[in-house]
Amino acid sequence: MTLAIGGHVQRARVCGFIVLFTAAVTFSAHAWSAPCVSPISSCTEWLTVPGTPGRLLLYRTYPLDTKNELVTSALVVIHGASRNADNYYRSALAAGFLADALDTTVIIAPRFAAGKARSDEGQECADKLAADELSWFCGGKENWKNGGAAGFAPGLTSFDVVEQIVRSLARREVFPNLRSIVIAGHSAGGQFAVRYAMANRVQDRVSVAMSYVVANPSSYTYLDVLRPTHAAMISRYPTLAPGYQRVPEPSQKPFVEFENAKACPGYDKWPYGLEERVGYSANVSNADLKRQLVARPVTYLLGELDILPLYGFDSTCSAMAQGPTRLARGVAYTKYVTEVLGAQHRQVIVPACPHSARCMLTSDVSLPVLFPKQ
């Protein structure tokens, strides 16, 4: 076990496990405390959006209202359907340690809590809420992962909340040396990330570079009636689409107008497509959604082994129209946005990773995407 005396965060590996702890260090009046590296109450704060009711809990390594000249980047990590922001915070901390970026990165993990469950949702969709805590439904179009409105604050969406986080980070009087903000999400958080990338209007209003990391979502948002064929899912990865590995006809196009629209009328409705949008995106035009998605830097992190219909896998006909597995859907969507829409998005297949946020976030191939070099 070796301690680096000069570092704020002391690091060690014990029996193969990553250990993070802070040493007792005396700081000058112009120095900054060590990052908070545990999902405990002292590492949390409540976020409010001016002019709106309610508040949202978030975990963070540094306070968002205390001047910090050490921080040069920010990582906002969005949890999955289980709303376990504390576990996602742990995974992001592990990734920050492996990237040697904990001291200079403010890591934030917001919690989009679930309030009273709808009649078609189980009790696992009802969290214990603090006073005035914002909450959302788990399912349906009007939920947090699609930019839906909060339960008792219909004018406030989950996308508005992350916009407020971005605005807080972009304040030069607090983070004068911040140069990049990464919005990353896994599973349901990946759905949030890709839809937030195309819809948000804050990116063009701040002076900090923003990028997006979309990891293993169960569905994407297509901007027209095209859907992938087998030709869009050809890959050197044999696990891509089990049962769908036949070689396509030479003349088969990778994307065609969806042929089963009559039997699957919801295939092009929000959040799978642009029809009948609700929440934040309802106030953004189709043209702006396309323009922003194409123009913004997005990386798709896809687990090589995320091929099983588990962990909330969306098996509706609208989702199945996008591919048979999460991996296949991600490969096809990357091809769609780059070849059909003309975006310059990237795709990274994460070796040996199934549907696991910890595996995805801490992989060697993921770290440069989550913690880009300045």
Question: Where do the model's predicted regions map?
Answer:
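A domain-start/cap signature at the N-terminus of enzymes
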Residues: 31-74, 82, 86-106, 137-154, ...
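Cap/lid segment of the alpha/beta-hydrolase catalytic domain
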Residues: 112-156
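Conserved strand-to-loop "acid loop" that flanks and positions the catalytic carboxylate
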Residues: 299-323
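Gly/Ala-rich beta-loop-alpha elbow adjacent to hydrolase catalytic centers
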Residues: 185, 189
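Short glycine-enriched nucleophile-adjacent loop
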Residues: 190-202
